[in-house]
Amino acid sequence: KNVPIVVISGKHLHPDHIHAPNVVISLISMHNTFRAILAMTTFLVTGALSSCNHTDELEPESPAPQIVFLFSPGGLGDMSYNDRILEGVQRFKMENGDIDIYIYSPESLQEAEKIFADWLERPQSSIPVLFVLGSSDYEPMAELYLAEHDLTPNKSILLFESRKQYKDENIHTFQISMFGASYLAGVCARKCSEMTPLVLLANNTDSPINIAKDGFIAGYGSDCDVEYLADDWTGYVSASLAYRKMSDWAVDYDFIFPVAGGSNAGIYRYSREFEVSPYLAGMDIDQSSLSNRITGSVIKHIDQLIYRYLTEWVVTGDMPENQLYGLESGYADWLVAPRYVNDFSSLVNGMRPQAKIFEKEYYETSGY
């Protein structure tokens, strides 16, 4: 029997509370409902189609494995990292219709913490369950609660964008390094920028984006100005603040490297509306179509990676314990925008081997 995808947004519900196995449940209570619906529409349709069956079909002898997915607060609908994750989960679901998938899209870090804590308290069962923490924002939360709770044998955890290695073999982590790709972005900025670039970060506590900052500065070859939109996860949902500040930044800088989330509604929007705008970099996916000032994009093939991890878990019951994926892996890269190919392609191709070397050296010496 095929089962649905359940999207749970803004509600403290658990899979066991739902007793309608052939119904797709969508509880939308996010701040940006329209964008969330756009992000989930294809996913929901897929789940609805896959859940059709005949009334006389027998129930399976054993319960289906479950995957519980906790997206970053306000992340779905970003047309970037989170939506790309969703695409990977959707692909997995289309090929594994017998797996229950429950998606939580919390409105705050506090809500996410409640969902995770409640799940950890659930008793052991015969159903294999994988809980996916789909954001580096959740690393402090995971460390706190996993120090106090042991996983029952049926539970596994996958934590995104973390370098921490846990003693429990059922806790798995990975990080897609942005150092090498950001290094190549910095190389391009050096060629087209006549002023000190601005590195704009969501916050100063998230190690993956600080790694991107270090890579960009290394590629640029000298110091850059650095600004933070917030001191916590809310920096990822501060597009309106970035938009307001762009009027000043457009005067002071001719290249901005934004690792802040929601840039399409902030920085890229400004560059579309005003003729005078700095050169920019896209983030996580190819965003060159969003602004003619985007010179290239730091690419994360997170959709391919999450598909691989989920498939491996279903087939083998296990996943790699702790992995780092950089330029060498193919899961990260710097993709030059089509309109700037003649300006940067040869330069980037020539510097890519050096970027791989510097990325490896960075992790050997930085402590990350």
Predicted regions and their residues:
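Hinge/cleft segment of the Venus flytrap/periplasmic-binding protein
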Residues: 312-368
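Extracytoplasmic "Venus flytrap"
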Residues: 67-88, 92, 103-109, 208-209
